[in-house]
Amino acid sequence: MTSEKKTLNITEIQALLPHRYPFLMIDRVTDYEEGQTLTAYKNVSINEPLFTGHFPKMPIFPGVMILEAMAQATGLLAFKSFGAPSENELYYFASIDKAKFRKPVVPGDQLVLNVEFIKERRGIALFNGTAKVDGEVVCSAELKCARREF
């Protein structure tokens, strides 16, 4: 028995996340299962404005941006698991623990982001996240996000 993969294109992603260029870190979602896991992609391009300063002679995608991409992936999984946001509601990145950076990410790399839902309590959801390039883990972390009105 084969199960069809659930995907999200950029239009569907923008309907769920409030982020826009240059801060939208998810290019597409290739699979997700509500309440369980989500796989997303971030294509790292030299054309991103952050590379003018990080670092001019050796461009490296900042670790905090990898974590932001993971956080956006958790927001997408949370919305798909617990319902789409109302007009004045979103998931805020609440905390990060056990973050580890294992290898630099450079222009031309494709980040494969995997997030796994662990538990939810009082509107705060806990996730495990990993980012891989060419099958190698470049970053891992535990992330929490909180659903709140703004």
From Swiss-Prot:
Highest classification ranks of the organism: Bacteria, Pseudomonadati, Pseudomonadota, Gammaproteobacteria, Vibrionales
HAMAP family xrefs: FabZ (MF_00406)
Active site: 54
Superkingdom of origin: Bacteria
Catalysed reactions, semicolon-separated: a (3R)-hydroxyacyl-[ACP] = a (2E)-enoyl-[ACP] + H2O
Classification via InterPro entries: FabA_FabZ, FabZ, HotDog_dom_sf
Protein's recorded name: 3-hydroxyacyl-[acyl-carrier-protein] dehydratase FabZ
CDD domains the record matches: FabZ (cd01288)
Gene: fabZ
Name of one Pfam family that matches: FabA
Protein family per UniProt: Belongs to the thioester dehydratase family. FabZ subfamily.
Record keywords: Cytoplasm, Lipid A biosynthesis, Lipid biosynthesis, Lipid metabolism, Lyase
Coiled coil: none
Localization annotation: Cytoplasm
Function of the molecule: Involved in unsaturated fatty acids biosynthesis. Catalyzes the dehydration of short chain beta-hydroxyacyl-ACPs and long chain saturated and unsaturated beta-hydroxyacyl-ACPs.
One GO MF term: (3R)-hydroxyacyl-[acyl-carrier-protein] dehydratase activity
EC number(s) per entry: 4.2.1.59
Gene Ontology cellular component list: cytoplasm; membrane
UniProt record, GO biological process: fatty acid biosynthetic process; lipid A biosynthetic process
